[in-house]
Amino acid sequence: MSRPPLILTSTMNATKGAEFSDDSTSLSHWYTRALAKARGAPVLMPNLADKKLIQSMVERCDGVMLTGGDDLHPDLYDPQLPKKIKATAGGIDADRDLSEFLLIEQALQQHKPLLAICRGPQVLNVALGGGLITDIPLERPGSLDHRRKAQAHRLTQTIAIESGSLMHKIFRTRSMKINSGHHQAVGDLAPMLRATARTSDGIVEAIELNKAEAKNSPFHLGMQFHPERLWERYPEFLKPFRAFIKACRP
């Protein structure tokens, strides 16, 4: 039996660890359980912002997953952002921001499959030259309520999926219901990326590489919603993890 693909997984720095009350590497078990269920083996990456270390870790792993968490530093995508909007960005972690930028760089250079969730597609877009909507309620008044963390395990919104996209191939539908738990979203798209799913108010819910870029890296998918919190109740949401692991098989 072949070994399970090793998936280098981004993490967040929790302020209180289980052993001592200091910074600790942290990751929700929903991510690791979804990867394991899809027959992948998660490898947690510390946020050390060390380019040589990250390069080596990507070389040894078969795929990369960017996970959710707090907000990117606004200066990374809009240094001129008004103070009122900038103040809505919370939980800034410069080490994580830089570590994930380096991780994305190496995943692309080494042509490794990449799956990005929640914060993940936002980081991917900014790292490749795109922008963010820093706070949907302030910058897109009248939009749907996207911050429904209390309903993270339920289907609350509907997305339209672009025909022929990787999202379409995975879920085999042009429309589906998802969960939602975010106040930020992908803004201006990076030149290498395209939006392949949106809610009815135009908010981007999935991004992929442009067709020309995808020839070198066929599996790069970012989902703003949280499939890892849905698959136990709605089995179809395990599909992106299975497709990702299949793309990662050595």
What is the predicted function of each stretch?
Residues 116, 121:
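Glycine-rich beta-to-alpha active-site loop
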Residues 1-115, 126-133, 137-170, 175, ...:
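N-terminal beta1-alpha1 cap of cysteine-dependent amidohydrolase-like domains
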Residues 221-224:
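Active-site-proximal beta-strand elements of phosphoester/diester hydrolases
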